[in-house]
């Protein structure tokens, strides 16, 4: 296909310039580093909530079957965001603005979400989780487009085609961030005193479960807004 031919051409171009030269340009490309940071932090957050979800539903809310509702409140908002994101980006003329303000508003909405979680008001907690997810969801669907923009910027400013290596930040970010997030769930549960064989968990274990699923992702979401705010590409 033409897409495969284009990709092959890009890879050949990268080989022509040499791995060392291309890698040197890459590590000095601030946009590549920022997108890589976004990927790593995003997937740390994602895997924290994925790994801790069943524990939060079972031990904090007292009903393991709630995990299905939690999953839907995270999946459907992203679908809605993906439907509206192109319209918003076209209207504002900036992917960076849409992503930044989406995550900024999402972070603010995390405050009432945490409050209702502490009050164990499930309906309001789920409502704010859903709304929060809609605003944060624009970034999920535009990360690859962001890489494409950064790749184009690199070609314009350096004259070197390095699309293949630019896209490596996605796989690297997923593996590193996902690995850290998954491992952190186990480490922090153990640190909090969680006992897998116990039917009733200690107060410290419950608190850690709450933090893993709700508080830590909230804090990480705020952190993500920092690199997102600097992803407006300038030649």
Region spans (language model):
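Juxtamembrane intracellular "pre-TM" segments in multi-pass secondary transporters
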Residues: 7-34
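Pair of pore-lining "gating" transmembrane helices in MFS-fold secondary transporters
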Residues: 32-48
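Short amphipathic helix-loop junctions that connect adjacent transmembrane helices
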Residues: 51-65
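Helix-to-loop junctions at the C-terminal end of transmembrane segments
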Residues: 82-94
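C-terminal ends and interior cores of transmembrane alpha-helices
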Residues: 106-118
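Helix-loop junctions at membrane interfaces in 12-TM secondary transporters
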Residues: 115-128
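A membrane-interface helix-boundary motif in multi-pass transporters
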Residues: 190-218
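Conserved small/polar residues in nucleotide/adenosyl-binding loops
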Residues: 231-235
